[in-house]
């Protein structure tokens, strides 16, 4: 069942290791088949070097395990909540990459300080609130998804304009049209978090530093890559 999608999800998960976004068995990637109402996700706690495409677990969008000999990722309810809240999302990645986690642990949005960030997201990457004790001791992973969705909705942000949210004291979740785009966004997020950290470090030692991107420059860079009249890259005909 969903053999092609399982292969894609497997390959996307292996990219987490290739890009050094995870260590040990941390992290997970999933992808959804909207027509069939199913999604595929990495199994829980399986070493990347021992994992195969056949190990990927098929879940329904109502939360039932449909196929797989292994348990799905413990973060499955988070992925499920995001797929159900945002139909435009086709793939989700969760990592514990160092720089993104540092910002999450600090409970800070990642400001847009330059055009690299603007090419990725149309504004600051939000850091969602921490979960309450009741939320943690209840359906923790499901509530994590609800907190992410709450953050986007409360700020009036489209998930495709801001393809990442940090969860306070936890880490980053990213998404995209497919699992490979979700992983790409996780990689870009790690880089912009690193750049933002270094920018603030430099600025702390120089009172004349001028940090923060102008709105018109941010908008230009975002729209030329992602807007209706985007002209970055090659057309589909090329």
Residue ranges and their predicted role:
Residues 1-238:
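Glycine-rich flexible loops
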């Amino acid at each position: 069942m969903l053999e092609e999608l399982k292969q894609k999800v497997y390959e996307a998960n292996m990219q987490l290791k290739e890009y050094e976004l995870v260590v040990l068995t941390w992290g997970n990637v999933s992808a959804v088949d909207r027509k069939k109402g199913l999604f595929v996700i990495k199994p829980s706690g399986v070493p990347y070097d021992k994992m195969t495409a056949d190990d990927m677990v098929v879940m329904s969008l109502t939360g039932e395990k449909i196929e797989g000999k292994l348990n799905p990722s413990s973060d499955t309810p988070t992925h499920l909540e995001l797929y159900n809240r945002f139909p435009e999302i086709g793939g989700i990645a969760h990592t514990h990459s160092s720089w993104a986690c540092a910002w999450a642990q600090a409970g800070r949005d990642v400001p847009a300080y330059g055009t690299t960030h603007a090419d990725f997201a149309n504004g600051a990457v939000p850091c969602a609130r921490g979960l309450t004790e009741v939320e943690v001791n209840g359906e923790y992973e499901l509530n994590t998804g609800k907190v992410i969705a709450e953050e986007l909705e409360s700020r009036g942000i489209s998930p495709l304009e801001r393809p990442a949210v940090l969860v306070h004291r936890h880490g980053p979740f990213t998404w995209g049209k497919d699992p490979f785009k979700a992983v790409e966004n996780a990689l870009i997020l790690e880089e912009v978090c690193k750049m933002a950290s270094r920018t603030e470090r430099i600025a702390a030692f120089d009172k004349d530093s001028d940090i923060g991107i102008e709105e018109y420059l941010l908008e230009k860079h975002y729209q030329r890559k992602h807007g209706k009249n985007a002209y970055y890259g090659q057309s589909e005909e090329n």
